Amino acid sequence: VLKPVAIYPDPARTNGALVMCEVMMPDGVTPHPSNARATILDDEDAWFGFEQEYFFYQNGRPLGFPEQGYPAPQGPYYTGVGYSNVGDVAREIVEEHLDLCLAAGINHEGINAEVAKGQWEFQIFGKGSKKAADQIWMARYLLQRLTEKYGIDIEYHCKPLGDTDWNGSGMHCNFSTKYMREVGGKAYFEALMAQFEKNLMDHI
């Protein structure tokens, strides 16, 4: 059973809507085992800033890669400008994606070319645990739907180029709670980091 939990204006359709749903068991109350959203401890005072990295892929390789081998080494692509660095359809796509997100009411904060050729990043800011998570998922969906018309795929895999020197992708997560913002203090943050450290390797 699908349970609507968030709704966004669909920028591709007049008077259309995009509806985020949770998957529930037939009783309509029990979350399905695949329903990770239902496990989130919602906190409206928690703020999140997501930095989603990804690759554009075309014909089985990152956009801008030659048919054989690799492009020029990493370095000038990061926040790059100019045809040799980002001179393909990527910039057009990321700008259009930004506009689509804003039209859908998603708090899209920015874009930049990343370290590897064909790799980009967008940033989403949200207040509230579930609301922030919903926004990043919907932003991903809009990006993948957008690139269909360009004949391009999106690759979110952490190391799509395997064991090479080429950069991988991740999603940095910046966060704060009301207590962190209003009280904070060195002792509190040291205690917080100590708790994170206990499960460091599990997260990695």
Q: Language model features by range: what are they?
A:
Residues 1-204:
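Glycine-rich, acidic/polar active-site loops that bind/position phosphate-bearing ligands
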